[in-house]
């Protein structure tokens, strides 16, 4: 009984270590990428969709595992992260590293088995960008690290699409950039609240390096670019007027919160923007999925 309990606790620790609150969204946007690529519910397409789902899940978990391994010293300093499984000692450094490596390699391997070579390339690029470019090279060196690191968070859309089809379309790339512009808004608005933590850990996040005013303007500019790439699919003819209407309604609070943040840069204003924009990407992709499924059924 004790062994079973210890085993379950260890599994739970590794699951928390993988940061499911982060990778579930990556898996979701990858799933939408796959759904957009299909025009029927044929069995082989559903199988490829499941392959993309598994690949994006294991790849995202692996990437989070490796970035957490790289950030272990920083996480042990920051109040917000010191109780995570690795800095708290729930899992070993060796176990954490192997967890990340095995899942990352598996995510590429499963795509290669099914001969999804372009999707495998995108998976490799996403992992390389997240683990090496963002976490290892840039995170502790520049406040703009999240911009280049944003590529990795957007790759699941392309992986989802190109696992299911080889057909070229602009829509997955538009959604790719939509995700890219959402990431700085999401990360920087939260970092504004915890900038003292980042300062103590020696991480030059944008809110740590720049003034309140410049930080607020930068975050708000990213918010406007996010809205722009949200409406582009309509003007390119990918979705109907209903999509545009919903996006415009969802975007109004972003504009209001962004303007208020610029007028009065405070932690409260930053968190309002963070709390509202956090589910924004999920809403947009969910709308896209519903519209496309309706089109397939027709």
Swiss-Prot record:
Similarity section: Belongs to the UbiA prenyltransferase family. Protoheme IX farnesyltransferase subfamily.
Gene Ontology MF terms in the entry: protoheme IX farnesyltransferase activity
Keywords from the UniProt entry: Cell membrane, Heme biosynthesis, Membrane, Transferase, Transmembrane, Transmembrane helix
Assigned EC number: 2.5.1.141
Protein location: Cell membrane
Other comments on record: Carbon 2 of the heme B porphyrin ring is defined according to the Fischer nomenclature.
Gene3D superfamilies xrefs: UbiA prenyltransferase
Protein name per its UniProtKB record: Protoheme IX farnesyltransferase 1
InterPro entries the UniProt entry points to: Protohaem_IX_farnesylTrfase, UbiA_prenyltransferase, UbiA_sf
Parts of the chain that traverse the membrane: 21-41, 43-63, 94-114, 118-138, 144-164, 168-188, 215-235, 236-256, 274-294
Topology of the protein relative to the lipid bilayer: Multi-pass membrane protein
Lineage: Archaea, Methanobacteriati, Thermoplasmatota, Thermoplasmata, Thermoplasmatales
GO BP, sorted A to Z: heme O biosynthetic process
């Amino acid at each position: 009984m004790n062994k079973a309990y210890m085993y379950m606790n260890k599994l739970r620790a590794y699951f928390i270590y993988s940061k499911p609150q982060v990778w579930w969204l990556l898996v979701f946007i990858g799933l939408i990428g796959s759904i957009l690529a299909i025009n029927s519910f044929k069995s082989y397409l559903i199988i490829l969709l499941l392959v993309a789902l598994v690949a994006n899940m294991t790849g995202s978990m692996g990437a989070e595992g490796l970035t957490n391994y790289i950030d272990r010293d920083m996480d042990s300093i920051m109040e917000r992260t010191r109780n995570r499984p690795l800095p708290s000692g729930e899992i070993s450094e060796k176990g954490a590293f192997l967890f990340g490596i095995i899942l990352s390699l598996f995510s590429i391997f499963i795509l290669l088995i099914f001969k999804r070579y372009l999707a495998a390339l995108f998976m490799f690029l996403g992992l390389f960008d997240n683990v090496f470019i963002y976490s290892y090279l840039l995170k502790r060196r520049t406040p703009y690290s999240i911009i280049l690191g944003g590529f990795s968070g957007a790759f699941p859309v392309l992986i989802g699409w190109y696992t299911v089809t080889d057909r070229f379309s602009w829509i997955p790339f538009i959604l790719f950039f939509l995700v890219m512009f959402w990431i700085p808004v999401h990360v920087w608005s939260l970092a504004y609240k915890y900038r003292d933590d980042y300062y103590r850990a020696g991480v030059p996040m944008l809110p740590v390096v720049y003034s309140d005013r410049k930080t607020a303007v930068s975050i708000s500019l990213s918010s406007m670019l996010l809205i722009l790439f949200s409406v582009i699919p309509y003007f390119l003819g990918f979705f109907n007027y209903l999509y545009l209407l919903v996006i415009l309604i969802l975007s109004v609070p972003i504009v209001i919160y962004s303007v208020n943040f610029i007028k009065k840069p405070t932690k409260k204003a930053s968190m309002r923007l963070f709390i509202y924009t956090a589910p924004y990407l999920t809403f947009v992709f969910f709308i896209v999925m519903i519209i496309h499924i309706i089109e397939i059924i027709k």
